[in-house]
Regions:
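Short, surface-exposed ligand- or partner-binding patches at beta-edge/loop junctions that are enriched
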Residues: 75
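Rhodanese-like catalytic fold shared by cysteine-dependent sulfurtransferases
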Residues: 1-33, 40-71, 80-123
Length: 123
């Protein structure tokens, strides 16, 4: 972990962010998946049915559930825990980004009729 931290630059940090609009575009093209790293008591309250749900503390043991050919967009309610998850995934060789503003920003982006902007059928 120390070597990873020493290798980080401001460029790395800036390229790790993705907006809710950018996420929707990439999700619709099949290039990304949403990783919801909240704990079960949080996802029971409100969830994102299209997300892969892996609590942050289980992430090291469940890496095999994540595709290596897509960008993993890490998300939590804001974007605090997702920073940790993103950096961990990058260290493990995944392509990963942080959802800017977190799930709150994504929920706001998809509010009401805008929910139709997210395409689930990519046949």
């Amino acid at each position: 972990m120390e070597d990873f931290l020493r290798s980080m630059t401001m460029k790395d940090i800036g390229t790790s962010l993705i907006s809710a609009d950018q996420f929707v575009t990439l999700f619709n093209s099949g290039e990304t998946v949403l990783l919801d790293i909240r704990y079960p008591f949080e996802t029971r309250l409100w969830g994102m049915s299209f997300a892969v749900e892996i609590p942050l503390n289980e992430l090291p043991d469940r890496l095999a559930e994540l595709p290596r050919d897509k960008t993993i967009v890490c998300a939590c309610p804001l974007d605090i825990r997702s920073n940790i998850a993103c950096q961990y995934l990058l260290q493990q060789g995944f392509k990963a980004k942080i959802l800017l503003g977190g799930l709150v920003a994504l929920a706001e982006r998809l509010r009401g009729g805008a929910a139709n902007d997210l395409k689930f059928d990519r046949a």
